[in-house]
Amino acid sequence: MDKIIKSIAQSGAFRAYVLDSTETVALAQEKHNTLSSSTVALGRTLIANQILAANQKGDSKITVKVIGDSSFGHIISVADTKGHVKGYIQNTGVDIKKTETGEVLVGPFMGNGHFVTIIDYGTGNPYTSTTPLITGEIGEDFAYYLTESEQTPSAIGLNVLLDENDKVKVAGGFMVQVLPEASEEEIARYEKRLQEMPAISHLLASKNHVDALLEAIYGDEPYKRLSEEPLSFQCDCSRERFEAALMTLPKADLQAMIDEDKGAEIVCQFCGTKYQFNESDLEAIISDKA
């Protein structure tokens, strides 16, 4: 089961979130039938949103959009504070040549664009923030967002590793943030440790990558685990929701679906689930609109 572990240095100088998101990204790949590069780009976006959602309280909904002018198109993810995330990538078929080490490149092909976040607190006034893509690698772009929009300097690492068949082998990441209590000496020590950390891909390839990430972040510094919470890919779409959407269409449009298509098929963008509405279903909707 996927999980996020929240921890804090015993000194109170900084905190860290460490994630195992392997099942989340694997299910997203299965749902959308994504090829290698699309899988990694979508996976990184999902992991970034899992981190962002874990930082919120209440019943907030968090939307992350990675909008570039590349062949990936838009990448959209929606998460809640209960560990659920869903998402899709506009172009599922991007399969760019890997590096010599087998890693999939994303940044060089993302193009210019923006990292957009929308946090809906349920009050009717969602908070929206837009920052430019810095590298297109998504992790660095997320870190830049946290620094610029939330005024919280953060170290972010996230990645998706694929096997020889381009299926998700492991996915996960981390976030480290300095807290106000940190002294200059503690900040300097923290920055030095981060600079010396192995690459995120190397840590994810470890036998137990969650422990490997924590060890790399804290080193010999004492810390305590605050919580361990489950994560999952979960879509909240339903037939009732799409039926309500059909109710908003003009009667003429619904009648055209009956006359021309003998019904309607609606496919959820986030999970690929198909919902069929036959002629009788559409006629009932028209009748309810009367």
UniProtKB/Swiss-Prot annotation:
Q: Name one GO molecular function term.
A: protein folding chaperone
Q: Does the UniProt entry include the keyword Cell membrane?
A: no
Q: Gene Ontology terms, cellular component aspect?
A: cytoplasm
Mind listing the GO biological process terms from this record?
Answer: protein refolding
* Protein location: Cytoplasm
Posttranslational modification? Under oxidizing conditions two disulfide bonds are formed involving the reactive cysteines. Under reducing conditions zinc is bound to the reactive cysteines and the protein is inactive.
Q: What residue ranges are annotated as transmembrane?
A: none
Alphabetically list the UniProt keywords. Chaperone, Cytoplasm, Disulfide bond, Redox-active center, Zinc
Q: What is its main location?
A: cytoplasm
**Known function:** Redox regulated molecular chaperone. Protects both thermally unfolding and oxidatively damaged proteins from irreversible aggregation. Plays an important role in the bacterial defense system toward oxidative stress.
So what family is this one in?
A: Belongs to the HSP33 family.
This chain belongs to which protein, by name? 33 kDa chaperonin
Q: What species is this protein from? A: Streptococcus pyogenes serotype M49
